[in-house]
């Protein structure tokens, strides 16, 4: 889902046939590999290419920054693990940040992000006074959903996204800690790679409702909303 840029090609112009030649011919396509092959010793970072055509004169190739997935990590022991491995496997670059204590965090340009991952943590999703960075994370979550940018929330991240979209947060009837089953309830088989019921690790006190427009994906005996999706 986050691999929308991994095979990016842009209609542009063809680099000339000789090594180091920057002349362009319109009506063809330039790929990252093509430019590496044709640019001699030049070093190119990223693979989204913008070619500026200058008539019959020489043209300029501008290399745009490689889109990154922003991973928001709140505590050292809640790491992205296999999420990070899978992102790397499909060729996406990532940047991991902890902004939980920062009122005005210096975040990457939103338009240049390929996606957002919000990890877990022991704080509450609405603990803005103690952890001011959570408010920035909620704002980022709303922007991602509104723009259709891929976003994934795990545990606390799931709660941050839900509350950012208007869902209610409350204490559960009892802490849910340890391995226990959840039931897949999605009607569109979004988690079709899993059994209808599977055992996962739980560690939370708070629970959230389903935000407006959300589709319920999984629940457990004590938590009605274990997973949901929203948007595209």
Regions found by a protein language model. Name each.
Residues 12, 28-29, 48, 52-60:
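Ala/Thr-enriched low-complexity intrinsically disordered regions
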Residues 144-168:
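Catalytic nucleophile loop
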Residues 21, 52, 56-149:
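N-terminal beta1-alpha1 cap of cysteine-dependent amidohydrolase-like domains
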Residues 3-13, 19, 23-26, 31-32:
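Low-acidity, Ser/Thr- and Arg-rich intrinsically disordered low-complexity segments
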Residues 165-232:
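Pocket-forming structural segment of enzyme catalytic cores
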Residues 35-38, 44-52:
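Targeting/processing segments of secretory and organellar proteins
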């Amino acid at each position: 889902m986050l691999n929308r840029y991994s095979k990016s090609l842009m209609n542009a112009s063809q680099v000339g046939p000789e090594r180091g030649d920057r002349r362009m011919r319109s009506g063809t396509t330039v790929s990252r590999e093509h430019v590496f092959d044709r640019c001699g010793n030049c070093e190119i970072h990223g693979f989204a290419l913008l070619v500026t055509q200058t008539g019959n004169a020489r043209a300029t190739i501008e290399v745009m920054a490689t889109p990154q997935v922003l991973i928001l990590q709140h505590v050292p022991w809640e790491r992205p693990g296999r999420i990070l491995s899978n992102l790397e496997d499909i060729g996406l670059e990532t940047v991991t940040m902890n902004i939980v204590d920062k009122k005005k965090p210096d975040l990457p340009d939103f338009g240049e992000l390929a996606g957002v991952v919000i990890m877990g943590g022991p704080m509450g999703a609405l603990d803005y006074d103690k952890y001011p960075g959570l408010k920035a994370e909620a704002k980022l979550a709303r922007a991602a959903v509104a723009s259709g940018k891929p976003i994934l929330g795990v545990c606390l991240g799931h709660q941050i996204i839900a509350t950012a979209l208007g869902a209610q947060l409350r204490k559960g009837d009892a802490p849910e800690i340890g391995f226990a089953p959840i039931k897949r309830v999605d009607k569109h088989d979004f988690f079709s790679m899993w059994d209808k019921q599977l055992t996962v690790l739980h560690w939370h006190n708070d629970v959230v409702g389903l935000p407006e427009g959300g589709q319920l994906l999984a629940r457990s005996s004590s938590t009605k909303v274990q997973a949901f999706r929203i948007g595209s």
